[in-house]
């Protein structure tokens, strides 16, 4: 009986220890918010029910703390976007043009920014968050709270390590989008051109 109780005691201690060391949302937020600047490449796959093959687009991105996100689409067409606290802007021949806040994809782009910057408090306003894994390999599941978001998304799955690696958006109508962030680096400062893009 003594051995059994000791085993139970050891098990309880192990459980408490693992709970104390559990990777939580606060730690994830701090981890993702650490880098001042992140440069990387992305591949986006849009799976539409009506099409047998996904629509694939590729490009590069720059995420800068206190500035926002530059989303530079290279293929199948070239188009630059800037997502910041001011809203979403698209570059044309005359410079950056702010898009209407209710434009298609505006909510999705704001969501990307919150995810990449580790803004869990911002995400918690709109989603139930469930985190699993550890600092090196984690997965975050977002389930919409609001009626509006429930009309668009069933669920959003985000996974990564030091930085975000993959974002998967599962839409209510059966379509889905998978974003893969590749070759992300957090050591390089903003170039003069990038600083100019954020300042405009």
What are these regions (language model features)?
Residues 42, 69-73, 88-91, 98, ...:
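Short hydrophobic/aromatic-rich beta-strand segments that constitute the beta-sheet cores
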Residues 92-114:
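Acidic/charged, solvent-exposed loop-and-adjacent secondary-structure segments enriched in E/D, K/R, S/T
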Residues 56-60, 80-82, 98, 155, ...:
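Well-ordered beta-strand positions in beta-sheet-rich domains
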Residues 124-128, 132-200:
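Gly/Pro-enriched, hydrophobic low-complexity segments
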Residues 51-55, 60-65, 69-75, 80-83, ...:
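Structural recognition of beta-strand segments within beta-rich domains
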Residues 1-9:
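Bacterial N-terminal signal peptides that target proteins for export
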Residues 19-41, 47-52, 196-200:
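N-terminal leader/targeting segments and the immediate start of mature chains
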């Amino acid at each position: 009986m003594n051995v059994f109780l000791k085993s139970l005691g050891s098990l309880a201690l192990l459980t408490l220890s693992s709970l104390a060391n559990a990777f939580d949302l606060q730690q994830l937020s701090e981890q993702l918010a650490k880098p001042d600047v992140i440069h990387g490449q992305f591949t986006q796959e849009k799976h539409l029910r009506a099409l047998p093959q996904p629509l694939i687009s590729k490009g590069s991105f720059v995420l800068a703390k206190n500035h926002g996100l530059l989303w530079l689409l290279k293929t199948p067409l070239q188009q630059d976007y800037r997502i910041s606290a001011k809203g979403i802007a698209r570059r044309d021949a005359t410079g950056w043009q702010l898009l209407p806040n209710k434009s298609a994809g505006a909510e999705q782009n704001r969501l990307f920014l919150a995810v990449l910057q580790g803004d869990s408090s911002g995400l918690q306003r709109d989603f139930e968050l469930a985190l699993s894994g550890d600092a090196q390999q984690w997965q975050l599941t977002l389930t919409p709270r609001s009626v509006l978001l429930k009309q668009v998304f069933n669920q959003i799955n985000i996974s990564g390590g030091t930085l975000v690696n993959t974002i998967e958006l599962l839409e209510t109508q059966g379509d889905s989008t998978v974003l893969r962030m590749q070759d992300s680096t957090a050591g390089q400062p903003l170039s003069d051109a990038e600083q100019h893009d954020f300042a405009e």
